[in-house]
From Swiss-Prot:
Residues 50-55, 117-163 are cytoplasmic. Residues 1-28, 77-95 are extracellular. It holds the Pfam family AGTRAP. Appears to be a negative regulator of angiotensin II type I receptor-mediated signaling. It comes from Xenopus tropicalis (Western clawed frog). Keywords: Membrane, Transmembrane, Transmembrane helix. One of its GO terms (cellular component) is membrane. GO terms for biological process: angiotensin-activated signaling pathway. The keyword Ion transport does not apply. It is a multi-pass membrane protein. The keyword Membrane applies. This is Type-1 angiotensin II receptor-associated protein-like. It is found in: Membrane. The chain crosses the membrane at residues 29-49, 56-76, 96-116.
Amino acid sequence: MELPAVNLKAIVFTHWLLTVFACMIDWLPKAYGLANITILAMGVWAIAQRDSIDAIFMFLIGLLLTILTDILLFALYFTEAEKASESGPLRDLFRFSSGMGIFSLLLKPLSCFFMYHMYRERGGEYFVNLGFITLSRDRSSYQSIEHMDPPADQDNKLPSRTY
C-alpha cells in the first residue's frame, strides 16, 4: 500500500495554525509557544532545503520532543487553567484554545510518521549504535545463502565440553 503524498508545507502550516490557536489565551507557559515555533522554524528550513537530510531529521526529532513536552505541559497546566476560566468570560475561548492544542498533539504522531517517510525518501538512514546494540540497515557484512564461506578459524575452535 502506497502512502499518500503529503506536502511538507501543509504539515508545517497546520501545526503553525494550531499552535497559534492554542496560544490565543494565556493558559500555557511560554515554553509551549517557544518550543513549537522553534520546531516549525526547522520545518521551514526543511522546506527551503529540499535535499537536506539534516533539516528533515531535525524537524522529525523536534516533533517527537514536542510531543513529550506538550503532554507534560498539558498535564501540569490544564486543570488549573480550566478552574480559573470555568466561570469567567473566557470559558469558550479557553475551550477552543485547549482543544486546538490537544488536536495539535494528536496530529503530531501522524506528522512524525510522514516526516520519517520523507526522511527515507530523501536518502536518510537511521543508525543506532549503543556499543553493544547496533541497529542499522548496513548489510555489507552479511553472507549470501547461496555462497557460504567456510569459517576462517577452524583450528582455534575450543573443544566441546562433556558434562
